[in-house]
A protein has these predicted regions:
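Catalytic beta/alpha-barrel core
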Residues: 15-17, 72-78, 96-105, 121-134, ...
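Glycine-rich phosphate-binding active-site loops on the catalytic face of alpha/beta enzymes
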Residues: 40-44, 144-153, 197-216
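Conserved, mostly hydrophobic/aromatic
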Residues: 39, 100, 136, 192, ...
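Glycine-enriched alpha-helix->loop->beta-strand junction motifs that scaffold or abut catalytic
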Residues: 31-35, 94-97, 114-123, 138-145, ...
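Catalytic cores of alpha/beta
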Residues: 22-28, 86, 131-138, 184-197
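Alpha-helix-loop-beta-strand connector modules within alpha/beta enzyme cores
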Residues: 56-70, 93, 109-118, 160-178, ...
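Active-site beta->alpha loop and helix N-cap motifs at the rims of alpha/beta catalytic domains
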Residues: 10-24, 29-32, 38-114
Length: 283
């Protein structure tokens, strides 16, 4: 859970971009994630509803995982007032761990400013230009989320824009983090981390790739084969064999005891049936 006494700035921070319970169960215990990010598109993809009650329950589900220090959820509305009201309602469950995402439009920035004023933690999302980091910092946002893959799809320099955003935050001496989103491959994470970026949200597919280098997997298999040949599992196998033999012996002893008990019962019945009655004895 989020600890207000801990300074999370300056530390690498990874989020899982998913609203899927199945994906949460697989990836959140891995140890690399500090929280979960969502948006209406992700909610729809993962079969979730987008309303205050449903998202409050979703937050409860996510925060049940020990790894989750933050849960990011997006507000909605056509006006800044609507976005502000929905943001307040979304954060109400636990303002210390819920971060409200707000699009970086004019109405969104106004809503973000109002939320920050009310003590709500905020992410300015759907950022496509470096100047949007300035806007986010100006209203006191905790995060600004540039969309790397979508910038590249639109013919923009996603990498260069995000690096410039990071430099802007550093120069402003701002605590705001550049939350890199729309990440398509693990190579981009490594390059951006080398350039100073320290906060990412990734899909389950990219998480799979983070742990899935084929050479690492093959080396691990080679290690296991050697370890097996030179006795790494011998003690465990011997213990299992002893347990098997002990269980078999106990089963045999129980069967023998049951047989002896049955034989004794049969003998007693036979003895009782052959004893003469009193009338026969007087003849």
């Amino acid at each position: 859970m989020y600890d207000e006494d801990v300074d999370y700035s300056g530390n690498l921070c990874m989020f899982l971009d998913s609203a899927s319970e199945e994906e949460w169960a697989k990836w959140l215990p891995s140890g690399i994630f500090a929280g979960v990010t969502t948006n209406p598109i992700i909610l729809e993809r993962d079969g979730r509803e987008c309303n205050i009650a449903a998202l409050t329950e979703l937050a409860k589900e996510a925060l049940a995982y020990d790894a989750v220090q933050e849960f990011q959820v997006q507000t909605w509305g056509k006006t800044s007032d609507e976005m502000w009201q929905n943001g307040i309602a979304l954060a109400k469950y636990d303002p210390d761990v819920i971060v409200v995402k707000v699009p970086g439009t004019f109405e969104g920035i106004k809503a973000a400013n109002a939320l920050v004023t009310d003590g709500i933690r905020v992410t300015i999302t759907a950022a496509y230009a470096s100047h949007q980091a300035v806007l986010a910092a100006a209203v006191g946002a905790n995060y600004v989320a540039p969309y790397l893959g979508r910038m590249n799809d639109a013919g923009r320099d996603g990498f260069g824009t995000i690096v410039e955003m990071q430099k802007t935050a550093d120069k402003l001496d701002s605590d705001m983090r550049i939350l890199v989103a729309s990440v398509r491959n693990v190579g981009d994470i490594a390059k951006l981390a080398a350039a100073g970026c320290d906060t990412f949200t990734i899909s389950a597919k990219v998480a799979e790739d983070m742990f899935g280098d084929p050479l690492t997997n093959q080396a691990t298999l080679d290690f296991e084969e050697s370890a097996t040949r030179i006795g790494a599992y011998r003690e465990a196998e011997e213990a299992q064999e002893r347990a098997r033999l002990e269980a078999k012996a106990a089963e045999a002893a129980a069967a023998a005891a049951a047989a002896a008990e049955a034989a004794a019962a049969a003998a007693a019945e036979l003895e009782g049936g052959s004893k003469p009655d009193e009338d026969d004895a007087r003849v």
